[in-house]
Design a protein with these regions (language model features):
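Active-site acidic/histidine proton-transfer and metal-coordination neighborhood
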Residues: 1-87, 97, 172
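Non-catalytic positions within long, well-ordered alpha-helices that form the structural scaffold/packing
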Residues: 16, 110-113, 153
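Flexible loop residues that form catalytic
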Residues: 28, 125, 165
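H/E-rich (His + Asp/Glu) clusters that bind or coordinate divalent metals
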Residues: 138-149, 155-163
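A short, acidic, flexible beta-alpha connecting loop/helix-capping segment that sits on the rim
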Residues: 161-171
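C-terminal helical cap(s) of enzyme catalytic domains, especially alpha/beta-barrels
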Residues: 169-188
């Protein structure tokens, strides 16, 4: 949470113990644009303080950041108002779940400047015959992986994080399938 990140000394100590130089906040919720603007300001302030201690702070999206509030979407507020100290960790499944194009958003974030998208969460979305959305192994769903991976390469993404929140398969089998599919697509 932002409150936990705001405990600067404790946060830095914890991450230094783990020799971890990156952390990401997994979401903020509000249906008011003013709250999102205030969050962007506060989040940037905390990220700046943590960056001074060697910790890079990012924002990990879900689908609600693409909801239209008043006159803007939270993702637009964040990308326009968070300072360069904040990186973005795009989650491909949740971008698609929101009806947006993951490769386009990777390009939007990359255009903000160097270092703004060091990692991407790779998850696929599958549409069932019953028109239900569900997570699937990378390459087994409906996402345009050639475009996503090209955008990641163009953005100089350093870490490709395969993630599976829920599924029918054993998590390790799911990971194996995703990795095999990514390798078949040329990602090493």
């Amino acid at each position: 949470s932002l409150e936990e990140l705001n405990d600067i000394d404790k946060c830095l100590s914890y991450h230094q113990t783990l020799d971890c130089h990156y952390t990401a906040l997994g979401g903020f919720h509000s249906d008011r644009t003013e709250d999102w603007s205030q969050f962007a300001k506060d989040f940037t302030d905390v990220a700046r303080k943590l960056a001074d201690g060697g910790l890079h702070v990012g924002y990990h999206n879900h689908s609600h950041e693409w909801a239209l509030l008043d006159t803007s979407r939270p993702i637009n507020i964040l990308t326009e108002q968070c300072g360069p100290e904040v990186y973005f960790e795009i989650d491909t499944y949740w971008v698609a779940h929101a009806g947006a194009d993951p490769s386009a958003w990777i390009n939007v974030i990359a255009a903000l400047g160097p270092g703004r998208i060091p990692s991407v969460h790779l998850k696929d979305i599958q549409i069932s015959a019953e028109r239900q959305q569900k997570m699937s192994e990378v390459g087994a769903g409906n996402l345009n992986w050639p475009a996503i991976l090209a955008a990641c390469r163009n953005a100089s993404v350093q870490w490709y994080l395969v993630e599976r929140d829920a599924g029918d398969l054993d998590p390790f089998e799911s990971l194996k399938i995703s990795l095999e599919n990514l390798r078949a697509m040329g990602l090493e």
